[in-house]
């Protein structure tokens, strides 16, 4: 099954009203970054053990670890959880910035360094959520290509290092 089909099945598998709300957030993420790379994780590790909630991912960033290994990962994530919905805004260097910029304006959501968690869309200002998503894409929009290139060059030269 391709990624779009996996995402459609994942969304269809949610009970209402969460299904409709997840579809609305999905639509807004795609509107914020049309044509972005899509990801889907079923939340299971290689052994089939559940390690996280299933997540839809959007966009691309390259994470470079301290040991020099690099991994491609999504910039924005969408996940249903037992109490509501989580939107992950990854790759922002300042871990206080997301909460500072959107925490008070978004309404009834918990905003941490990289996660916006809410019970229902009725509790939040959805336009501010979309603004936060756009911010997440823009904050490191040029980083994936720069990072990937830097990792390749450093790997050829004997290993990439994590920036401090």
Locate predicted features.
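Charge-dense, helix-prone N-terminal extensions
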Residues: 1-164
